[in-house]
């Protein structure tokens, strides 16, 4: 689960981290009143969406007068903001964050995330802040891996401070900040805490100017405050609906629908489709409790995406019996108008029975595939016809 910048900064404050004063607003009048309340002569007017790259997309403006606050708020509120992370469809801006201006001397990048390969916490830092970290040269980035059983230590912070060429005073301030961020990361079940930029002010303080946080959905049951920060408007409606049926669905931008059981097989199926020149339209794991009704619902959700030109069903029957999937496919054809080709590869428990069920149904656009690669190739070929 992701949250907005204004919510992330609320959490930063909860953990004793100094951030600039700001107020979330939903109207132009509120934006103007917020700027007056904050005081000063410079304000940042920031679109609040769950995506990075807002500045480049025109979603962050620096106002040097109340008239400019009003002007920028009018332009940004209600706009469809397109960034590298939103995709071409963009996101509608419904909220703004009005933040008091900061005297910036230098910008850095700092983040904490989970390193799955090394099974540790990775602290990533760079002296090139304020831009996408993916675009920064590798030799300008330092990654410090922290053993969770040991935790953050002075030498971790010193290594980062040395890499960033900070003086003694700032090195101490960085360690204090990192210690608080590390505690925030652990105690909120985060999977990402990204500060970009972390700014050095002209007053010689280190201040998070922007903050992005993501959380482990499976831990939200013990994070009531964070769970209440969920903004349904920022999430894909089909993904939310899928969850209510026990389906794990993520919309992508390809044209080949995927229905698979098991996250690992789903990833392998998507890789195979990519490998034979196709592009998946979604990730969909029907899970271990799939029945004909949930399979039919999965078809319905996949087919809402008008970009889908074929569907590849790849099931290895274990907990999920293949005959259940076959009956679900037939149920879907009754409940939903399935006009695109459906390529079906079934293996494992009751695979023979499933093949017979589909054969007896004699539906022309349901095509059996003998193996994964053949099914992927057929899906790509039929999608491109």
UniProtKB/Swiss-Prot annotation:
Superkingdom in the source lineage: Bacteria
Single GO MF descriptor: magnesium ion binding
Cofactor names: Mg(2+)
Pathway: Carbohydrate metabolism; tricarboxylic acid cycle; succinate from succinyl-CoA (ligase route): step 1/1
Xref: HAMAP family: Succ_CoA_beta
Its job: Succinyl-CoA synthetase functions in the citric acid cycle (TCA), coupling the hydrolysis of succinyl-CoA to the synthesis of either ATP or GTP and thus represents the only step of substrate-level phosphorylation in the TCA. The beta subunit provides nucleotide specificity of the enzyme and binds the substrate succinate, while the binding sites for coenzyme A and phosphate are found in the alpha subunit.
Record's protein name: Succinate--CoA ligase [ADP-forming] subunit beta
Species this protein is from: Campylobacter fetus subsp. fetus (strain 82-40)
Lineage: Bacteria, Pseudomonadati, Campylobacterota, Epsilonproteobacteria, Campylobacterales
Gene: sucC
């Amino acid at each position: 689960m992701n949250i907005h910048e204004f919510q992330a900064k609320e959490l930063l404050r909860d953990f004793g981290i100094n951030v600039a004063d700001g107020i979330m607003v939903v109207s132009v009048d509120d934006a103007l009143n917020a700027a007056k309340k904050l005081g000063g002569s410079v304000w940042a007017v920031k679109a609040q969406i769950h995506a990075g790259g807002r500045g480049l997309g025109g979603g962050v403006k620096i106002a040097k007068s109340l008239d400019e606050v009003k002007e920028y708020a009018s332009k940004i509120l209600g706009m469809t903001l397109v960034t590298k992370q939103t995709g071409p469809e963009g996101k509608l801006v419904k909220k703004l964050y009005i933040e008091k201006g900061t005297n910036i001397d230098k910008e850095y990048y700092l983040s904490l995330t989970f390193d799955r390969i090394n099974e540790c916490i990775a602290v990533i830092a760079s002296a090139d802040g304020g831009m996408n970290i993916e675009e920064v040269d590798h030799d300008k980035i330092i990654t410090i891996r922290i053993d969770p059983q040991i935790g953050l230590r002075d030498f971790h912070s010193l290594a980062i401070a040395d890499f960033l060429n900070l003086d003694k005073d700032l090195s101490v301030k960085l360690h204090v900040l990192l210690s608080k961020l590390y505690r925030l990361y652990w105690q909120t079940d985060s999977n990402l805490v990204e500060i970009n930029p972390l700014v050095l002010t002209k007053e010689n303080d280190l201040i998070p100017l922007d903050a992005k946080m993501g959380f482990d959905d499976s831990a939200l049951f013990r994070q009531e405050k964070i769970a209440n920060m969920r903004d349904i408007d920022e999430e894909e409606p089909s993904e939310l609906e899928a969850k209510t049926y026990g389906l794990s669905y993520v919309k992508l931008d390809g044209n080949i629908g995927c229905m698979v059981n098991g996250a690992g097989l789903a990833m392998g199926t998507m890789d195979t489709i990519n490998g034979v020149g196709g592009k998946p339209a979604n990730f969909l794991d029907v899970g271990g409790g799939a029945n004909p009704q949930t399979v039919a619902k999965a078809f319905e959700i996949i087919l809402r995406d008008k970009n889908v030109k074929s569907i590849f069903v790849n099931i290895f029957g274990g907990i999920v019996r293949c005959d259940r999937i076959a009956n679900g496919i037939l149920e879907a054809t009754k409940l939903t108008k399935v006009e695109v080709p459906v390529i079906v590869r079934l293996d494992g428990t009751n695979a023979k029975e499933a093949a017979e069920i589909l054969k007896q149904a004699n539906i022309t656009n349901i095509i059996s595939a003998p193996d994964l690669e053949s099914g992927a190739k057929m899906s790509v070929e039929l999608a491109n016809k």
